[in-house]
């Protein structure tokens, strides 16, 4: 998102770079939980214990879901407060807050989808997990191009467009993960 915004506005690029630090922190928690789920899940997959895999998945989903929901709610309702952690008042806070209000919900979706993609990986469907994740990244880039710069009849939306592109890509990723699990 930030890279593609660099061609339009340096403030937008910097603000989104700062705003995505929130997602980076959330991603670290998600990574830790999915790592634990994958280790335990792989062991139970080897034992053909699908009931335990299901139990581990539910625990991981609840843990990631609650953490990601908390982050999404903060981003939606307190984005200025979050941005002030990284920047003083001004355009960085304003642009970053606008981005977080939209993209914040995608953080919930990303966390949940990572749980589903992890289950695909441990049940011998790692290729499908990679295709879904990679396709979501490609879709995000294409939608960034459309929404940030205003192509194909859409208005140029700048940082808000980057957030919208991220949200749409994560919705598609989650749906694909659920339908494939």
Where are these regions (language model features)?
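Interfacial/gating helices of multi-pass transporter permease domains
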Residues: 5-24, 91-95, 159-164
């Amino acid at each position: 998102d930030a890279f593609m915004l660099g061609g339009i506005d340096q403030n937008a690029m910097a603000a989104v770079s700062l705003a995505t630090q929130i997602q980076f922190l959330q991603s670290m928690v998600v990574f830790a939980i999915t790592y634990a789920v994958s280790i335990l899940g792989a062991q139970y997959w080897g034992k053909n214990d699908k009931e335990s895999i299901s139990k581990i998945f539910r625990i991981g989903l609840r843990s990631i879901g609650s953490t990601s929901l908390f982050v999404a709610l903060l981003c939606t309702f307190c984005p200025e407060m979050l941005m002030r952690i990284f920047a003083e008042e001004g355009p960085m806070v304003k642009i970053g807050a606008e981005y977080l209000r939209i993209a914040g919900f995608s953080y919930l979706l990303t966390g949940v989808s990572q749980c589903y993609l992890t289950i695909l990986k441990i049940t011998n469907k790692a290729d499908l997990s990679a295709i879904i994740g990679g396709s979501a990244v490609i879709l995000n880039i294409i939608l960034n191009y459309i929404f940030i710069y205003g192509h194909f009849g859409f208005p140029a939306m700048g940082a808000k467009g980057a957030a919208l592109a991220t949200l749409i890509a994560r919705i598609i990723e989650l749906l694909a993960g659920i339908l494939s699990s």
